[in-house]
Amino acid sequence: MEIDPNYVNPKYSSLKSTVMNSEVLTSKYKSAIHHAGDGELEDDILAVMEELHSMLQEKGLACHTENLEVFSSTILHLKTTGQENRAGDLIAAILSFGCSISAQAIVPSTLLKTMSEMLDSFATRNHELKLITKDLQEVVPRQVLKAKKKSKAKSAEGPSASTEDIKDSDTKGNQDIGDNGDLNSSINQRNREICYKHYTTDEFEALSLEKRQEIMKYYIQYILGAWGYNATDPTKTAMLYDLIDKHTVITVMRQSKEGTLTSDDILMAIDEVIDSVNSMSSCYGGYKATIGNDNGTPYLVLIPKEGVILLSYPPPIPVTHHYYNKALSFIFPCAITIFSSPIYI
């Protein structure tokens, strides 16, 4: 028996159309999204589904909720991977295909077979795109978040700023600049949360809290060379834990264990932290990060806004990169505990 895609349970039939659209259809769409395993992108996919549904209605076309979810998740994936033109082409193709099918009045069985094949193809391509995106995330350097400066208020006589003008552009890495005078301001709290989520990874988050803290303390002191690091200071702790890229942490720690860590690798890791601190330290009180050098060994230097070096000074004994690579577990026993984790096997 064929089911009308626009069928609404009788108990909702007395509701106004606007209410039904916002309550009944939204509930159906969310159910389809979670059934497809895309719950983490619920809000984004839901917005595309509603927009595509509106376009189909304008053409007098109907689409089953499950099919609409597949189309919408594919369109969203194309948009988020920078393929806006292809997403537009896909929408146009869906509308054109629907209109041509309607005009030709194909018998239901043939239409069902055609749509099923099309749906299978979309599902396959969408899965392939997700795998490609995951691989790219592993090899492409993580984008450094940037703090955007506050613009001056526009004149009352001039054109007013539109919503799009003042809207945060998180996907481009631009955040409202922090308030150095108030670490607990809403802007600073929001930006710190964004920074943490941006620079962490699923693999790192899967570790226990104790293991994560142990790894980060070791990385900060012995890889970045921050020998003066004070782990009891919550502000410095939060800034370094948030702004250090956890993908780099895991990669470098594995290289250390395998004896393949080079001076260039350490220099790149320090430069990466310098970029992120100089971009977003305003929401941690304001610091300037730079690089120091002790007999050819680079180390991280953090200078607070007062101008006094607070963290990271030359280590008390000469440290060579051969020392980092070959004598790691012997000189620093904590490395043995860290590297015993299953993720480093």
Curated annotation (Swiss-Prot):
Domain of life: Viruses
Claim: Cell inner membrane is one of the keywords in the record: no
Composition-biased stretches (Basic and acidic residues): 164-173
Chain spans, region Disordered: 148-185
Localization (cell): Virion
Keywords: Viral matrix protein, Virion
GO cellular component, one term: virion component
GO molecular function, a single term: structural constituent of virion
Listed name of the protein: Matrix protein
Species assigned in the record: Sonchus yellow net virus (SYNV)
Gene name in the database record: M2
